[in-house]
Regions:
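Conserved phosphotransfer cores of two-component systems
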Residues: 33, 52-54, 76-83, 104
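Conserved acidic segment of CheY-like receiver
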Residues: 7-21, 25-29, 40-41, 47, ...
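… and, occasionally, acidic/histidine-rich disordered N-termini of signaling adaptors
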Residues: 135-313, 366-380
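Alpha4 helix (beta4-alpha4-beta5 surface) of REC/receiver domains from two-component response regulators
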Residues: 71-72, 92-110, 114
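Conserved phosphotransfer microenvironments
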Residues: 44-47, 57-80, 93-95
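Receiver (REC) domain switch/output surface
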Residues: 119-131, 217
């Protein structure tokens, strides 16, 4: 907030269509020792246009009872708060409404009939400072997420292996938050390939670091481990080197033998994979806990056969836990719908289509969602 000696007045955009309330707010600001310039508009649409054309230090949003009742007022707070700090002015002295307004992004909620010079000036000062600190925090977070995204992308395999008798495709969509999703393929000569899909807990740099550490150990140890369960045990021991037990990794790790189509896997706390084989459907559920939680953890190794025409889809929880604006989950039904709509499409297209379908599903949700990773194996 500017001091009394600041070189320019505080630019205030007032959204108010009640003449009496408009006069009251102007009168209060005129009495303040600080200098303000106020431009008033009668509605949110006009305010959005004004904010696009000029720079303002603060928005005072007068909300009527009807706007609060139908939710339009709260939506206005969310939109306007992206541009400038918002203080809500209302005739309603309602604590629940005040809390909702702040949750949607308002810096303060003031009752019009109780408005005083000191109260409004203090609220403006604090609102501007909180908005400034939040903007700085968001800039730091954005920088961190760019680093995390770079780490995540740099650890993805450069190519998808060409496997006789099988078509393999993969796709990873990073959310704005960037989690610890990853996938990997490791050649195991002469006739096997290892396939991994994992999710390291945490967002930003912490999740990216744990993801990178997990993939590093996986790549270093896969060739020397005779079975998937041996690899998972080795990986768990390697990741348990510190005391940060709040962090963990879910992992679906399997080895595909080309000639037979036998797929041996361990599911360490990861979402169940979906196997569609002709008219038969089965899920490859968790066979043990996530990695990095327990030194004495136990897992079970299982084997399935991928017959000609079978499709196996392995995905991260960002796919099935995608939510629409009614908080309904994409879930396994969404995965099944995409995989059965065009079953003969190339694996890479199926993987990409599934990620995109989950993204579209949650488009209207206020939650940005999680990373989405999909690996598809089609047997010919």
């Amino acid at each position: 907030m500017p001091s009394r000696t600041e070189s320019r007045p505080v630019r205030v955009l007032l959204i108010e269509d009640e003449p009496t309330d408009l006069a009251r707010v102007n009168r209060v600001l005129d009495q303040a020792a600080s200098s303000f310039t106020v431009r008033a508009v009668p509605e949110v649409r006009a305010a959005a246009t004004e904010l696009g054309a000029r720079s303002y230090d603060l928005v005072l949003l007068g909300l009527a009872r009807a706007e609060i009742g139908d939710g339009d007022g709260f939506e206005a707070i969310r939109r306007l708060g992206k541009t400038a700090p918002v203080i809500v002015l209302s005739r309603l002295d309602d604590e629940d409404i005040a809390v909702k307004a702040v949750q949607r992004g308002a810096q303060d909620y003031l009752v019009k009939d109780r408005l005083t010079v000191d109260l409004l000036v203090r609220s403006i000062r604090y609102a501007r400072e909180r908005h400034r600190l939040l903007a700085e925090q968001n800039r730091r977070l954005e920088h961190e997420l760019k680093i995390a995204a770079f780490v995540q992308q740099s650890f993805l395999p450069g190519r998808v292996p060409e496997v006789p008798g099988h078509d393999i495709g993969a796709h990873l969509h990073s959310s704005g938050q960037v989690g610890g999703d990853f996938y990997d393929f490791i050649d195991l000569p002469p006739d096997r390939v290892a396939i991994a899909v994992g999710d390291a807990s945490g967002k930003g740099i912490p999740g990216a670091i744990l993801m990178a550490e997990t993939q590093g150990v996986l790549r270093a140890e896969a060739a020397s481990c005779a079975t998937p369960i041996e690899l998972v045990r080795t990986l768990n021991r390697a990741l348990l080197h510190d005391q940060d037990q709040d962090r963990f990794v879910t992992l679906f790790y399997g080895v595909l033998a080309f000639p037979t189509g036998r797929f041996t896997f361990v599911n360490a706390g990861h979402p169940r994979a979906l196997l569609l084989d002709g008219a038969t459907e089965s899920t490859l559920v968790s066979t043990g806990p996530p990695l990095r939680l327990f030194a004495d953890a136990a897992w079970e190794e299982k084997t399935v056969t991928l017959h000609a025409g079978a499709r196996l889809v392995i995905y991260s929880d960002g796919v099935t836990e995608a939510q629409d604006d009614t908080e309904r989950f994409f879930d396994l039904e969404g995965v099944r719908a995409v995989m059965t709509e065009s079953p003969d499409r190339p694996a890479v297209e199926l993987a990409r289509d599934l990620c995109h379908a989950a993204e579209e599903f949650e488009r209207g949700s206020p939650d940005p969602g999680d990373d989405k990773t999909v690996v598809v194996i089609r047997s010919r």
